[in-house]
Design a protein with these regions (language model features):
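Nucleotide-sugar-dependent glycosyltransferase catalytic domains
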Residues: 1-175
Length: 175
């Protein structure tokens, strides 16, 4: 279990940002290989890959390898919108407006992607036999097109953005 292997106490207690990032990169690379191998075995005979925010990159790679559709499922908004800023990005003042709200999603996605990019490339090459994803990320991968994205939150708590298309579905909480 990767959670048991990660010992981040020393880097965190030391407060050294570079040491923290270096440790996380090493753990992500080791984890990515295990996740790709386990995911490949788990997907044998499946018709669909489902991935959320923590596994979206390996989910995309598995869907590409197996030529399966990918259903994205998230607990927080992950699709860019002008309605409000990304929950993964520092809070923006309300006067920043819609364009910067939308940009905050792109920036949050890029921060996630760049942190995981080398691990994803390793898993794609060594386990899945795939080429590396784009420097900018796999967000335009074919397996992401045309399929619904499910959001497990209440529209009474987080309103469905009016600029999302018909593929985005706010379903209410998942318990």
């Amino acid at each position: 279990d990767i959670a048991q292997r990660i010992d981040m106490r020393a880097p965190l207690e030391g407060g050294n940002f570079l040491a923290i990032m270096s440790q996380m990169a090493r753990e992500a690379q080791q984890g990515a290989l295990a996740w790709a191998k386990g995911g490949l075995a788990a997907c044998h005979g499946m018709d669909l890959v489902i991935a959320g925010i923590g596994g979206v990159f390996i989910g995309i790679a598995l869907a590409e390898k197996l030529r399966l559709p990918l259903l994205q499922a998230y607990y927080i908004p992950f699709t860019p919108t002008r309605a409000y800023p990304s929950f993964l990005f520092p809070r923006l003042p309300p006067w920043f407006g819609g364009a910067l709200n939308r940009l905050s999603y792109q920036l949050a996605r890029q921060m996630m992607w760049q942190g995981f990019r080398s691990a994803d490339g390793l898993a794609r090459r060594d386990v899945l036999g795939l080429p590396s994803a784009s420097f900018w990320g796999p967000f335009n991968a074919e397996c992401l097109q045309y399929y619904p994205i499910l959001y497990g939150f209440s529209p009474s708590v987080i309103p469905r953005p009016p600029d999302w298309d018909g593929n985005m579905h706010v379903t209410g909480y998942w318990f």
